[in-house]
């Protein structure tokens, strides 16, 4: 799951520098859907 988040977030961080936005989003969403929101294609 961590690898999925890295593949999804890191490229976006380099483009948008959205760390302040994504970091709290990850911490709040992680216990809810366990990464289903971040990498639905990989989860299937």
Curated annotation (Swiss-Prot):
Q: Which one GO biological process term can you cite for this protein?
A: pyrimidine nucleobase biosynthetic process
- Residue runs in coiled coils: none
Report the superkingdom from the record: Bacteria
Report if keyword NADP is assigned.
Answer: no
Could you tell me which Pfam families the record lists for this protein?
A: PyrBI_leader
Please provide the record's keywords in A-Z order.
Leader peptide, Pyrimidine biosynthesis
| NCBIfam families xrefs | PRK10224.1
| Protein name (record) | pyr operon leader peptide
Per the UniProt entry, what species is this protein from, by scientific name?
Escherichia coli (strain K12)
Gene for this chain: pyrL
């Amino acid at each position: 799951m961590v690898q999925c988040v890295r593949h999804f977030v890191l490229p976006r961080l380099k483009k948008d520098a959205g760390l302040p936005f994504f970091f709290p989003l990850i911490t709040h969403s992680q216990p809810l859907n366990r990464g289903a929101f971040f990498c639905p294609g990989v989860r299937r």
